[in-house]
Amino acid sequence: MERFLRRLGVPERCFELIDTVIATCEQCNAFKPVPRRPRFGAELAGHFGDVLMVDLFYIFGMQFMLMIDEAVRYKVAALLANKDGKSIMKCLLLNWIRYFGPCKCITSDQEGGIKSDDFALACDRYSIHRKMAGSDDKGQHTTTGLVERHIQLVKCSSLKCEMQCRQEGLPVDKEDIVVECAMGQNFQLEYNGYTPAQGVLGHN
């Protein structure tokens, strides 16, 4: 927030109120996540398109898939019609591959649709290697921590945005809220001083 306020030329004295404003924000406090130690499993892919991490999540009674590039953290959320292999691959084709091309490797948890023969055939057609995440002794995935953390970010921001829209009486579709919250984070989150959008598109 401080970075955006500086871009707007807000007076310095206003920065002292940031913590107070956040602490009294009804939408922020309503969906404040429980603090916990994050568990990441990224393997530091060298370039955009090397490794694409995918996972499914549910919100507002709908099923979505989050796709995130491991190298630059650029992500896309899309509504998923079904959990079978054909539906997952079609979602990938329409929302990722047709814009950025096929990735070299797809990493996911032990999702049935991604493990299916239909999905395997589609991956072979595009020369995509599948990598299934393993689990530790506690049953937690060992290599999908990155995408799971970003799902938390998307869900939290979507819940806040939906509550704000509802209170203001704005007729916004809930699917649009989830998709746009994921998209907006490509322009807001920073890694080593650059946003994911800058890493992929060259600008914000």
Please report, for each region that a protein language model flagged, where it lies by residue.
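Short, charged amphipathic recognition helices of the HTH superfamily
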Residues: 1-5
